[in-house]
Regions:
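N-terminal beta-alpha supersecondary unit
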Residues: 1-64, 206, 260
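Conserved hydrophobic/aromatic positions in well-ordered beta-strands
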Residues: 16-18, 127-131, 234
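A glycine- and small-aliphatic-rich helix-loop capping segment at beta-alpha/alpha-beta transitions
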Residues: 20-21, 76-86, 134-136, 192-194
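Surface "functional belts" at beta-alpha junctions
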Residues: 34, 89-206, 258
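Phosphate-handling active-site elements
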Residues: 49-56, 83-93, 108-111
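DPxDG-like acidic metal-binding loop motif
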Residues: 61-95
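Acyltransferase
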Residues: 198-260
Length: 260
């Protein structure tokens, strides 16, 4: 089994190939939001690093959101096209789950019970979830178990719900990751009790295809696969123009064609 994973939902694009043994081969961009021009190059690099050809890929996975609307569309469309061309199934991976998995090692090392991936959705809004960082029964494998729903939260709402949960377990620590830290660190610091939170380093904070690949391999082994036309984006909310159109507040000059 050789799974290609695509990540385009955040600042930086990346692609990874994972094999049956869990070995991951990755390529990533250092240019912000250059997904459209750079993704095919990154895929080629990751496949080459894995020492295979595209024809040897058995699955194509995409980080389906939430995140940048444009980035999500690029990633999902690229995965669909490759799946159709190669005749292999697709795998959908939650961006928030992939972020939690990426942070898992550091979170456990920091003594954190909860991993909190937070994506900035602007105006105090976030896309977020809360995961419990646990070891499996053999104490050799780590898992991120969802304990709060992945959805759109106001940052204050997220912290209030998280605080209520943490109060049930005295001395627990939350490990925050994602670009929501960049936007809302002051609010988090003023709301959370001292010593009850840790921020991910910038080197770990943003989305990357490696964790998408690890989740995708597990899903492939479990048979959680899709046809190319079943792979769908997860925006978690309508684009601003779509919200305004639905609410009837979009300008008539935008909604209706101008007669010439």
């Amino acid at each position: 089994m050789k799974v290609l994973a695509i990540e385009t939902t955040g600042k930086y694009g990346s692609a990874s190939v994972i094999d049956d043994d869990g070995r991951v081969f990755s390529a990533s961009s250092s240019e912000e939001m250059n997904h459209l021009r750079g993704m095919i190059t990154l895929i080629d690099e990751a496949v080459r690093e894995a020492g295979i050809t595209k024809d040897e890929l058995t699955h194509v996975a995409a980080s389906v959101g939430p995140g940048s609307f444009t980035g999500i569309r690029i990633g999902v469309t690229t995965a669909r096209i490759m799946s159709q061309m190669l005749g292999v199934p697709c795998i959908a991976v939650s961006t928030l789950e992939a972020m939690a998995v990426r942070a898992l090692d550091k979170a456990i090392s920091a003594g954190a019970l909860y991993v909190v991936p937070v994506i900035n959705a602007r105006r105090h809004q976030t896309y977020a979830g809360v995961y419990e960082a646990v070891f499996t029964t053999d104490c050799e494998h780590q898992s991120a178990i969802p304990v709060m729903e992945e959805k759109q939260y106001m940052i204050e709402e997220l912290l209030e719900e998280l605080g209520t949960r943490m109060a049930e377990h005295s001395g627990t620590v939350a490990f925050f990751t994602g670009d929501g830290i960049d936007a809302y660190s002051e609010i988090i610091e003023s709301t959370m009790a001292g010593g009850s939170y840790v921020f991910a380093d910038e080197s770990l904070r943003y989305q990357h295809a490696e964790s998408v690949a690890r989740i995708a391999l597990r899903k492939a082994n479990a048979g959680e696969i899709l046809k190319y036309n079943e792979l769908m984006p997860e925006y978690m909310r309508l684009a601003e123009a779509e919200q305004r159109l639905k609410a009837g507040t979009l300008s008539d000059r935008i909604r209706k064609p101008v007669k010439i």
